[in-house]
Each structure stands twice: as C-alpha cells, then as structure tokens.
Amino acid sequence: MPTFRPKYVTFDCYGTLTRFRMNELARQIYGAQMDEPKMLHFLKNFEGFRRDEILGVWKPYGDVLCNAVERTCAKHAIPYRHEDGIAFYNAVPSWGPHADVPAGLSKVAAEIPLVILSNAMDEQIPSNVEKLGAPFYRVFTAQQANAYKPRLH
C-alpha cells in the first residue's frame, strides 16, 4: 500500500503559529476606559470589524487595523487616536509563536517543506517567521496576493 506524502504543508501564521495578541494590546490601550463586561464587548466588536475590513477590496494591513480600531472606538464612544491604530500594526512583528509550535514545526520541517499563507504585509512577516524556529520553503502574504483570507468572491 502506497504511503501518502504531501509535497508541502501549509499554515496560516497569525493565531495558528504565532500568538495573536490583538486582545492583549486592546486591553493595554483601552482597558482603563471601561469595565470588564464593556471590554469583552469592545474586543468582540474589534474582532468583527477586523474581519469586515478584510472581506472587501484589498488594502494594506495597517489600514485594516486602523479602520477597525476607529470603528470599534466609534461604536463604544471612545475617542480614536491614529497612533493607537498604528500601535496595533507595529506590534504584530514582535509577536512570537505559541509555546508548543517551534518543536513541532521543526519535526515536520525535517520531513516536509513548510509554507505559510498569511494575511500579513511583506514588511511584517519575516520577523514572525524568524521566531517560529523552523525553516520555511515559502512564505506568501496577503500583500503579494492582493487579497486576504477568506476571500468570499
């Protein structure tokens, strides 16, 4: 019986391999302005607005995040500061992997080439990939594809 061996193994990066820390940063920036129930609602809206921003025509991820932060702040009657939106974008390259990711990825990479398909910008992703602790055959970004995942049309 033949054994199936994939040519590549593909991964998303943010949230799957890299610990996606948007909520932590939102709490850091806005937590003092609201109680916990309101914060949970803020975080839910922020996630929804980020998703909504990627479903349309492609735009740079910095715009996606700034627009999502601005929309969330407006919904919660919190003043929006552009520098806060930019802080989310600038934080992304500093995020590292989930604790169990590097060892597992290294084992797989020894046998099968790894590929990332990410909703990232070209300038951001190298820092995140470097922190994963395994070699990647290819890394493809939303910027290169001129589209975000999921693409519904």
Task: Mark where each language-model region is.
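Structured loop/turn residues at beta-strand edges in well-structured enzyme cores
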Residues: 4, 110, 134
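A short, structured active-site edge motif that brings together acidic residues
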Residues: 42, 135-147
